[in-house]
Amino acid sequence: MPVLRSIRERFAAQRPLDGTTVAACLHVTAETANLVRALMAGGAEVALCAANPLSTQDETAAALVEAFGASVHARRGEDADAYAAHVVACAKRRPHVTLDDGADLVSLLHAGGPRSRARLIGATEETTTGLLRVRGLEAEGRLTCPVIAVNEAHAERIFNDHYGTGQSTLDGILRATNLLLAGQTFVVLGYGWTGRGV
């Protein structure tokens, strides 16, 4: 992740996020760990919980805590009660910014009283489902900060949908079937951004 590494180095020198609290409800993976490290290098206090307990990499969560001093509330396979408690733990940090995958964190902050979201100045949401929840808050007149719809960004379609999903799809097929691709015939249903990546 050379771009993120470059940002982390610049952030470490400039510290643009000093005094900023970031709460993230994302997949706890090595990729997310690099994002957390970049934010922390920039001076942010970061609290991370899992957007999906089944994707949590326990070794990554442990490394973030032990090697980098991050606040991580996640465990692979945690039950619904533990998941909810971990989202609450991040919300209790009274973040300035949230990074969400499913809108659990930003929704919880808006369900609480004004004090719970008093410092909230912005958020990001990665998923279509999460954006439906955010737009519901907006329609009710309850959304108190701008939310960046990551999933609707042109760069998301180009890089993640096209290249990332294409790569992940082929990788998943290869791992699940143990087939050699040479000489195989594939049928790709749909030929949008994602289908072209496959």
Question: Predicted segment positions?
Answer:
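Glycine/serine-rich phosphate-binding loop and adjoining beta1-alpha1 elements at the start
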Residues: 1-17, 48-184
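Glycine-rich phosphate/diphosphate-binding loop of Rossmann-like nucleotide-binding domains
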Residues: 26-43, 156, 160, 164-198
